[in-house]
């Protein structure tokens, strides 16, 4: 990182955990002096709209008002990804100030996004935790679950199934395992859908579509409050926010349900 001078210029990412400082729902833009950033530490992490994009080191005390990244999912996808990148880099730098091998202090490397131990030279890169997320279809129906973290007395959000990939596991194996563990359902015809960085704090969501093969819903009660098959033409419960890969998977699956119904 460098110490900002008054004339340093560009777009500015200021983070507090997974919260960001925005001006009129946009990244602050201009010279450091005008945004009261002179003398703070920052690093350039790329460009945004043909101007430098700076990540400002998180301040312990800051009177600015910050907004949660989770409330910004409705922003254009490219802008949301920029904000997510800033949050993830900030999380990495905050949690890797000391070497995981010998315990001494680390410092940022000059030529890549990494930190290096000042004692043993061990180098660490940002940690990304791969997770799978899958929408399961059975004819005209989609499988949706109410996870315990989403439960509310009014029902809460119903969404697709998801989970972290375990050590030594392929994405495909993780999908099969998570669906069976959480609902007792076996699936087939698994195919890749898309991915989404998920900076809460450092996941990469890898999305799949799948078809039902066999089994009856049997809940993993430590994780799932409820799971049901919903027909595309019936009222649906509360769904994940627009902009999430979960919502995109649900939309794509409902379209497949409609297409199959037309062919019947």
UniProtKB/Swiss-Prot annotation:
GO terms for molecular function: magnesium ion binding; manganese ion binding; NAD+ diphosphatase activity; NADH pyrophosphatase activity; RNA NAD-cap (NMN-forming) hydrolase activity; zinc ion binding. It holds the Pfam family Zn_ribbon_NUD. Keywords: Hydrolase, Magnesium, Manganese, Metal-binding, NAD, Zinc. A divalent metal cation 2 binds at residue 178. A motif (Nudix box) lies at residues 163-184. Its cofactor is Mg(2+); Mn(2+); Zn(2+). InterPro entries: NAD-cap_RNA_hydrolase_NudC, NudC-like_C, NUDIX_hydrolase-like_dom_sf, NUDIX_hydrolase_CS, NUDIX_hydrolase_dom, RNA_Hydrolase_NudC, Znr_NADH_PPase. A divalent metal cation 1 binds at residues 162, 182, 223. Substrate binds at residues 112, 125, 196-203, 246. GO terms for biological process: NAD catabolic process; NADH metabolic process; NADP catabolic process. Its EC number is 3.6.1.-, 3.6.1.22. Homodimer. HAMAP family: Nudix_NudC. mRNA decapping enzyme that specifically removes the nicotinamide adenine dinucleotide (NAD) cap from a subset of mRNAs by hydrolyzing the diphosphate linkage to produce nicotinamide mononucleotide (NMN) and 5' monophosphate mRNA. The NAD-cap is present at the 5'-end of some mRNAs and stabilizes RNA against 5'-processing. Has preference for mRNAs with a 5'-end purine. Catalyzes the hydrolysis of a broad range of dinucleotide pyrophosphates. Belongs to the Nudix hydrolase family. NudC subfamily. This is NAD-capped RNA hydrolase NudC. It comes from Haemophilus influenzae (strain PittGG).
